[in-house]
Amino acid sequence: MQPWFFLRRAAVLFVVSLAVLPLVHADSDMDAQIRDIVTSELAPTATASDPGGLAAAVYAGGQVTFFNYGFADAAAKRPVTPDTLFNLASLRKIFEATLVALGTGRGELRLDDPVSKYLPELHGDTISHVTIGELVTHTSGLLLPTDHPPWPNETFTREQFIAMLNAWTPPAGVAPGKQRIYTHAGYVLLQLVLERRYAMPIATLIESRILQPLGMTSTFVPARGKDNRAIMPPEIMQRVVQGYSDQGTPIGAPGSQQSYYDFPGTGQMFSSARDLGILLRALLGGAVIDPALRAALEMTEQESFPVDQKFGQAMAWEHVRLDGVTVIDKPGGLNNASAYVGLVPARRLGIVLLANRGEYPHEIARYRILPAIAKL
């Protein structure tokens, strides 16, 4: 082989390397800027004086980066890691909305189906006409549980819930499909509809139709034991956080289940920042997944009920229109847990925040972190 060939080949490689170097530098510079933004916002919210800890996952530039602060269990000095398991609280509603979207895409149910089609025991004048679509978009008119007396305690039964729904009369000016009112009761009812339609528990539906196809192996919808703790194997329970109040008081044992009654459609799902990073990839087009599941995820994000110029409701997700960017997100919280998922689909950008304390200020992701990264 002639010497000129090697010289020519070396010259080509040198030129290519010069072209790639700026791209590599730009990517590393972008990563550093993202880390600076996230760290500067999150670190002050999870100091040594704050209760519990915080796990975050940021999807940007086609990759997931993790940020960890504080303790999963302060007494045991067990630190938070990307694999620590947190209670997702109302983030679970995203998964139930995805089940509805999957069923719609497969022709198994319709958004305009009345809930009484699947639960004929619902015969009240108002509730019998509420639709699946109204439940999943918080437009049914049903309220938060504390506004639906008699509600609730651990002896509150399914029969009492159905009786309450049949007796329900919306207040003046409220009607199914006419307003957006955030409701746990609506999602408890949605869970019952899904279980009746598919003749299987909601945990099995979520596991078989969403978690397994996405490869989310550290996300669980456990049954609740007699001690109100999640029933999970010991090796899994060792990864679960101790929950704290916003003042730092431990609330319940690790894995404790807070439920409005024995049908926990309002929450009770455990996952890690690493597993929810997989969900971020799927939601933002960064993973190869089943086309039907991709279509369902995209369907859940579509705004279906504009509330005002700044806010709109999708299927579980909320749309927040800020200057120059629209954030699609879902917060969740209990008195000992806080969770948040936020997306900027236009920039293929997303964030997960998981905290083992009540009242964590997740708004910093919506109003500060996501807009700042979106401008890079």
Task: Give residue spans per PLM region.
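Bacterial N-terminal signal peptides
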Residues: 10-20
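Bacterial N-terminal signal peptides that target proteins for export
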Residues: 2-12
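Short active-site loop at a secondary-structure junction
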Residues: 48-54, 76-134, 172-185, 264-267, ...
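Short, well-ordered beta-strand elements
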Residues: 329-330, 338-357
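Short, gly/Ser/Thr-rich active-site loops of penicillin-recognizing serine hydrolases
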Residues: 309-310, 323-325, 358-376
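Short, surface-exposed loop or secondary-structure junction motifs
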Residues: 66, 73, 125-335
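Boundary at the C-terminal end of the N-terminal hydrophobic targeting segment
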Residues: 24-26, 32
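Short, conserved catalytic-motif segment at the N-terminal edge
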Residues: 31-86, 108, 169
